[in-house]
């Protein structure tokens, strides 16, 4: 209510000492209130950890998504990553220093230890640092030193063309699809299309 009164009396400038205002930041509520009250809102381009970390990562920037902060608890975090397991775009996250190691542990578990990623901290500041490698390599790195500063983590999206599935993996996935009520024929077709593999291979596994 007080902020709304200020809007009607003067020009308001929203600034922050922690990156771009309103990006994974409660400042968006002030912007929404101004818009809802009929005020004109303008943005001055400034530094953004999202695009800066992406540029430093060396990972694909053709398509990317910003996911903010992952859940704090291990169970919720793992479940959250499971929802992103099929994401093909490069993913960008923010994380607090005391949770970086646990974040990487969960990410390696769900996305795979070999998934390429990068970690950037203190960007545009004196102690700026970017470390690149697999999720497992980054996890080991995070355990070997004290985590200080604000972190932005970039993880490569799923590359379906490079995936390798064992017969056991395909058999389990096929069983799961049939468990949803699909006929075996439809389950075979759906699995082959989703994983971009031949129907013949899935058919042979289904009839072993």
Residues of each region from the PLM?
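Short, hinge-like loop/turn segments at secondary-structure boundaries
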Residues: 8, 31, 57-62, 110-111, ...
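Acidic, metal-coordinating catalytic cores used for nucleic-acid/nucleotide bond scission
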Residues: 18-26, 72, 97
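Acidic beta-strand-to-loop metal/phosphate-binding motif
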Residues: 12-21, 91-95
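General beta-strand structural signal in soluble alpha/beta enzymes
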Residues: 43-46, 93, 119
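Class I SAM-dependent methyltransferase SAM-binding "motif I" and its flanking Rossmann-like core
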Residues: 29-87
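A contiguous loop/helix-start segment that scaffolds small-molecule binding in enzyme catalytic cores
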Residues: 11, 90, 97-208
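Short, small-residue-biased leader/transition segments that mark boundaries at the very start
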Residues: 1-7
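Glycine-centered tight-turn and secondary-structure capping sites
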Residues: 26-28, 184
């Amino acid at each position: 209510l007080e902020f709304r009164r200020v809007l009607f009396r003067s020009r308001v400038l929203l600034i922050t000492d922690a990156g771009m205002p309103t990006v994974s930041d409660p400042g968006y509520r002030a912007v929404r209130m101004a818009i809802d009250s009929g005020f004109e809102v303008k943005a001055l381009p400034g530094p953004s950890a999202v695009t800066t970390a992406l540029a430093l990562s060396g990972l694909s920037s053709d398509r990317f998504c910003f996911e903010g902060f992952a859940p704090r608890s291990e169970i919720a975090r793992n479940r959250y990553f499971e929802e992103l397991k099929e994401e093909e775009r490069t993913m960008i996250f923010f994380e607090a220093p005391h949770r970086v190691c646990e974040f990487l542990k969960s990410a390696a578990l769900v996305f795979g230890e070999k998934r390429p990623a990068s970690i950037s901290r203190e960007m545009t500041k004196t102690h700026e640092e970017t470390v690149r490698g697999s999720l497992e390599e980054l996890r080991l790195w995070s355990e070997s030193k004290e985590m200080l500063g604000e972190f932005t983590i970039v993880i490569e999206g799923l590359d379906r063309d490079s995936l390798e599935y064992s017969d056991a993996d395909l058999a389990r996935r096929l069983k799961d699809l049939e468990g949803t009520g699909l006929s075996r024929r439809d389950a075979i077709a759906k699995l082959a299309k989703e994983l971009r593999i031949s129907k013949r291979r899935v058919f042979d596994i289904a009839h072993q």
